[in-house]
Amino acid sequence: MSGSMFSVFSLLYLLSVCSACYISNCPIGGKRAIQDSPSRQCMSCGPGDRGRCFGPSICCGEGLGCLLGSPETQRCLEEDFLPSPCEAGGKVCGYEGRCAAPGVCCDSEGCSVDQSCVDGDGDATAVSQPASSQDLLLKLLHLSNPAHPYRLHQ
């Protein structure tokens, strides 16, 4: 009897440490299918299709800024129904985000002010002599609370 109990516990232990791909969250083609598929650019959105989708209701573009939850972002909802993942443009910033507009970092859940998304090399002279009022505002926000970025959620 004790041998069978040991076998049962051993089996349960092995099942608990194994990572499985369950039917509810397994991508088509298996766990590694998403990594193997080539990334595509996210759908265009906004007025005149000048922006790109960064989330289900986030549309950002150069010269456009970011639109959150507006009628222009409705097209971004379709992105969830496409079988392959997309990659929004811009360099990597924040935590799993991408630069969406000058000074703005967005991920699939929201956007935040991020100094690394401002064009330029970010040296000390840029802090002392900002190029525009937008740069000045971004620098003041960054200096006032560098530990907690200002996050705009939907």
Curated annotation (Swiss-Prot):
PROSITE patterns: NEUROHYPOPHYS_HORM (PS00264). InterPro entries: Neurhyp_horm, Neurhyp_horm_dom_sf, Neurohypophysial_hormone_CS. It comes from Catostomus commersonii. Isotocin causes contraction of smooth muscles. The modification Glycine amide is found at G29. GO terms for molecular function: neurohypophyseal hormone activity. It comes from the Eukaryota. Disulfide bonds join C21-C26, C42-C86, C45-C59, C53-C76, C60-C66, C93-C105, C99-C117, C106-C111. Pfam families: Hormone_5. Residues 1-20 form the signal peptide. Keywords: Amidation, Cleavage on pair of basic residues, Disulfide bond, Hormone, Signal. GO terms for cellular component: extracellular space; secretory granule. Belongs to the vasopressin/oxytocin family. This is Isotocin-neurophysin IT 1. SMART domains: NH.
